[in-house]
Amino acid sequence: MSVKWEKQEGNVGKLTFEIEQEKVKEGLDRAFVKVRKTLNVPGFRKGKVPRQIFNQRFGEEALYQDALDILLPEVYSQAIDEAGIDPVDTPQVNIESMEKGETWVLTADVTVKPEVKLGDYKGLEVEKRETELTTEELEAELKQLQERQAELVVKEDAPAENGDTVILDFEGFKDGVAFEGGQAENHSLELGSGQFIPGFEEKLVGLKAGDEADIELTFPEEYHAEDLAGQPVVFKVKLHEIKTKEVPALDDELAKDIDEEVETLDELKEKISKRLQEAKEDSVAQAKQEEVIAKAVENAEVDIPHAMVHHEADHLMNHFAQDLQAQGLTPELYYQFTGQTEEAMHAQMEKDAEKRVKMNLVLEAIAEAENIEPTEEAIDEEISTLAEKYGMEKDAVRAALGDMSELKSDLKIRKAIDVLLDSAVEK
């Protein structure tokens, strides 16, 4: 196969490649077998017309497009391999020459993976973070657990305070007219939770059970409902009941209620301390990794093709939709609830996608600079891990992974991150 690659400005180039006569003939033969199955030609049973009759009646050129569709995936893949390029999207292929009995000539404007100019990536300074669990952190966790065991008790003849839960009716009015979505009865609301628009919960503080009030507020300018954004409204409210949290004492009995595997508060503290210590060490390690990667990426230069960003954004959007589905929602419902649009969400995803794409490109470049190649032992170990995780046989995992290119790429990137971490200087 004759292949020519002409690098142009940026990350785009022109790929010229040929399909030789013998290969063209193979494609035409396969195309005829495909087309003949659907043909109805007088004098012949369906799907039984001879090739010679087909050529006389329709012309061999009638098979060209089908033959090209059949051959193109194979010959294009071979062409990019011979040209030594790494396309980042599927280009439009143009026909330069497609004459009978001759070699076919095709061209494609191909966007390729960009070159990365690495900056400093070894010996990068990172913040030294404390990994030892503090007494304050343990006490804060115990307080949270203690408050989770709290019971709500009715507050008799006392005003509502932040932290109390009130049961109320409310109805919102704009210009004296009730607006949609502004009404509820026997609604439970924890004061200070920030569930309502600014000012609503604050103005309930001080009211008692049985009180009625008119609360004058202005909706935020960025509120999702355009007809209410920035508009003054009045909420008519009636408090039916006020409940306050009754927090139990932090003792052995509470410890057993929190965790049935312990008998005393000291045992609970020891168990929680171990969990929090491990979590803090993991958090510190993750923060160090993120910081050193961010600095290596910042020091590198790369011109990222928009196609890569767009593809990654699409990937993130698909994950977002799957996460919503797991919660019983659809993207359409999410946009309706939040007032956001799909276009705005995709634009935000593109910002995140650009960061992810650059990070991966830089880490791949570091792996290449360090001549990192995963060993067979590392590959086999990763396959064993995946097999155990998903409850599959190792051979099934290997079959699912195919040529292992994705797995090898992941292992290379992990090793590249290790290079950054091992050489980082904590200060």
From Swiss-Prot:
Subcellular locations according to the entry: Cytoplasm
Q: Name one GO molecular function term.
A: peptidyl-prolyl cis-trans isomerase activity
Q: Name one GO cellular component term.
A: cytoplasm
> EC annotation?
5.2.1.8
* PROSITE patterns (UniProt xref): FKBP_PPIASE (PS50059)
Which InterPro entries does the record match to this protein? PPIase_dom_sf, PPIase_FKBP_dom, Trig_fac, Trigger_fac_C, Trigger_fac_C_sf, Trigger_fac_ribosome-bd_bac, Trigger_fac_ribosome-bd_sf, Trigger_fact/SurA_dom_sf
Q: Which residues form the PPIase FKBP-type domain?
A: 163-248
Pfam families assigned: FKBP_C, Trigger_C, Trigger_N
Catalyzed reactions per annotation: [protein]-peptidylproline (omega=180) = [protein]-peptidylproline (omega=0)
Q: What biological-process terms (Gene Ontology) are attached?
A: 'de novo' cotranslational protein folding; cell division; chaperone-mediated protein folding; protein transport; protein unfolding
Keyword list (alphabetical) reads: Cell cycle, Cell division, Chaperone, Cytoplasm, Isomerase, Rotamase
Which family, according to the similarity comment? Belongs to the FKBP-type PPIase family. Tig subfamily.
- Supply the HAMAP family for this chain: Trigger_factor_Tig
- Report the domain remarks: Consists of 3 domains; the N-terminus binds the ribosome, the middle domain has PPIase activity, while the C-terminus has intrinsic chaperone activity on its own.
Free-text function comment from the UniProt entry: Involved in protein export. Acts as a chaperone by maintaining the newly synthesized protein in an open conformation. Functions as a peptidyl-prolyl cis-trans isomerase.
Q: What is this protein called?
A: Trigger factor
Native species: Listeria innocua serovar 6a (strain ATCC BAA-680 / CLIP 11262)
